[in-house]
Amino acid sequence: MKNIAIVGCGGMGGGHAVAIASGTGNAIWAGVPGQKEGKLQPTDTDIGPLLSLAGVCDIDPARVAWARERGYRVYDAYQDILDDPAVDIILIATPNHLHKEEAISAMRAGKHVLCEKPVMMDSHELEEVLAVAAETGKVFYPRQNRRWDKDFLIAKKIFEDGTLGRVFNIECRVQGSRGIPGDWRAKKEFGGGMMLDWGVHLLDRLLVMVPERVTRVFCDLTHVLTGEVDDGFKMHLTFESGLTAVLEVGTCHFAALPLWFLAGSQGTAVIDNWDCTGRVVRLHSWEDKDAKPILAGAGLTKTMAPRGDSSVETLPLPQVDFDNNELYLNLVDAIDGRAPQIVTGEHALRVMRLMEAAVSSAETHAVVEFEPALPV
């Protein structure tokens, strides 16, 4: 059993507190406003025997009162967590600009760290933190929980199992219409903006899905409703094999494109939303004869004529089994030396550097070379 304390008990930290205290972990944030009460699924591990909530710490009196109402121990200051010998792990869920100092002080106090994303403000901060992790021998674990999103795992399975033939384009979009939350996320000094908020998730997952060098990146940042930080972006990436990817985040989209779109030489897959409705349309056989021209708008086309029903088949999206709490299980196993980290600081560093390359592209309006080929 590991004792875990949480610094930062706002929306994310409060959700973590409820989930850890209840034993449901990532599976169900029971009791969080807007979330349904529920039970662990058969594939989900109860983390109750693995992790115990030691307490929380927050500077907001309202959040302190909230924690006390739930019966959680409240530390008066972060230093009190550092000084508590019973605490094994500190979960950092404060605004982004505080992560570096909190992580460093935690590891130097003998604690392991589970850190909310983005783990740092930039790659230089993360390099410092990883150096301290190596120096102290403590685990620094980036909390990239969206690797366990069902939609991503379905997309990854389709990409890997050859259903679509050679996949040549992957697109993933996260879209809303409410702008950026009106808190620290809208402030540059606190690490706000959608690149750091959602870009870190989309890039993390894409780099897990496609184990290749990223050779080029081009990006546009949007400032539709905000001037200080980006409220969205559209990023184009090219991998060494020629595969391309488009990642897009929008906070002023009142109608949404599909969450995932994968195009391959033998088919196409669409995942509509987080409920994972969608389909796979796969080539059944090539037609020997040319298509008949169709009227499209003001002219005829053979190229864009739809295929006959006999040449393609439409399939449901594949099913995936996964443990929502694998991150917590792996965290404990990594601390105890039973397994390597699934989410590593080195991978987070690559993601951070790629985000910086994307921002540089947006600022210069130019393609940025990212990971050039090694000399022969």
Task: Briefly describe each language-model feature range.
Residues 200, 248-256:
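Glycine-rich phosphate/pyrophosphate-binding beta-alpha loops
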Residues 1-70:
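N-terminal Rossmann-like dinucleotide-binding module
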Residues 12, 139, 146-226, 365:
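Predominantly a Rossmann-like dinucleotide-binding segment in NAD(P)-dependent oxidoreductases
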Residues 89-91, 316, 330-376:
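C-terminal helix-rich "cap/oligomerization" subdomain common to oxidoreductases
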Residues 72-80:
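Conserved SAM-binding strand-loop segment of SAM-dependent methyltransferases
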Residues 44, 145, 266-343, 376:
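C-terminal glycine/acidic-rich active-site capping loop/insertion
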Residues 89-96, 100-147, 162:
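Beta-strand-loop-alpha-helix segment that lines the small-molecule cofactor/substrate pocket
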